[in-house]
Amino acid sequence: MASSFSRWLVDPKKNPLAAIHMKTLSSRLRNYGLRHDDLYDPMYDLDVKEALNRLPREIVDARNQRLLRAMDLSMKHQYLPEDLQAMQTPFRNYLQEMLALVKRESAEREALGALPLYQRTLP
């Protein structure tokens, strides 16, 4: 019951509030030329950092360029020009598959009782 409700809650095809949220998020990401996967912070989650390290260099460079452009536009209190906003694809994922693979590998290592490949320590 709870899982079907939660699936309904986040599905924009079934829930009109989720559709409104997705449309709003899409327009805000288009304003700065970002993709949804650009919002993941590699300093917060080490799995994201590992997934970014495994991606091809061109994809990571494009991500960094989008983030730099978004920061520059934000500091100038501007948005992308309308013609560039129309070309943006905010929900084209490039990180999800690799992130799922990294999370599966870390869950498998944990299930086998092995030490994690990477861990954060306090200085």
UniProtKB/Swiss-Prot annotation:
Post-translational modification: The N-terminus is blocked.
Protein name: Cytochrome b-c1 complex subunit 7
Lineage start: Eukaryota, Viridiplantae, Streptophyta, Embryophyta, Tracheophyta
Annotated PANTHER family: CYTOCHROME B-C1 COMPLEX SUBUNIT 7 (PTHR12022:SF0), UBIQUINOL-CYTOCHROME C REDUCTASE COMPLEX 14 KD PROTEIN (PTHR12022)
Keywords, in A-Z order: Electron transport, Membrane, Mitochondrion, Mitochondrion inner membrane, Respiratory chain, Transport
Pfam family, one: UCR_14kD
GO CC, any one term: mitochondrial inner membrane
Subcellular location: Mitochondrion inner membrane
Membrane topology qualifier: Peripheral membrane protein
Family to which the UniProt record says this protein belongs: Belongs to the UQCRB/QCR7 family.
Keyword Metal-binding in record: no
Oligomeric and partner information: Component of the ubiquinol-cytochrome c oxidoreductase (cytochrome b-c1 complex, complex III, CIII), a multisubunit enzyme composed of 3 respiratory subunits cytochrome b, cytochrome c1 and Rieske protein, 2 core protein subunits, and additional low-molecular weight protein subunits. The complex exists as an obligatory dimer and forms supercomplexes (SCs) in the inner mitochondrial membrane with cytochrome c oxidase (complex IV, CIV).
